[in-house]
Regions:
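N-terminal single-pass transmembrane signal-anchor helix
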Residues: 2-27
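Aliphatic-rich helix starts adjacent to a transmembrane/signal segment
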Residues: 26-46
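N-terminal alpha-helical signal peptides/signal-anchor transmembrane segments
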Residues: 42-59
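Extracellular/periplasmic head regions of type IV pilus-like filament subunits
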Residues: 60-113, 121, 130
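C-terminal partner/receptor-binding element of secreted or periplasmic proteins
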Residues: 123-125
Length: 131
């Protein structure tokens, strides 16, 4: 009236095979989600930096700004991230836009570069493993 031991073992083997096929696919989705997460954090830092650049330019309106006029600590505070995670912040030659910004979360590095043409990037955001 119940299942035999052989039938239960067959069911368990089938479940194990299905799980073995799904785990690599799920791992890929997890990696993509982690990449999207660091891109979102980097985008937040870039938007904060651009906001501060626009505010500073509006105050002075004297032309070119320098990176030193926009402290990384202010960018991190506005983006609500740790200032130690932001590096390589630079303005474009006109001093009016973010040219580059690198964000590190401890495992991966995301670099913002609007001129990026890399095929493995998400537009202006390039994610790589931390060295």
């Amino acid at each position: 009236k119940g299942f035999t031991l052989v039938e239960l073992i067959v069911v368990l083997v089938i479940i194990a095979i299905l799980a073995a096929m799904l785990i690599p696919a799920l791992t890929g989705y997890i990696d993509k989600a982690k990449n999207k997460s660091i891109i979102a954090e980097t985008r937040s830092a870039v938007m904060a930096a651009q906001t501060l650049i626009d505010e500073e330019y509006g105050k002075t309106n004297v032309g070119k700004l320098e990176e030193t006029e926009i402290p990384v600590e202010d960018i991190a505070e506005l983006a609500e991230v740790d200032p130690d995670k932001i590096s390589n912040f630079a303005l474009n030659t006109e001093g009016t836009k973010v040219a580059t910004l690198t964000y590190t979360d401890g495992k991966k590095v995301c670099t913002y570069n609007p001129d990026n043409k890399s095929s493995n990037s998400d537009g202006a955001y390039d994610v790589s493993k931390e060295e």
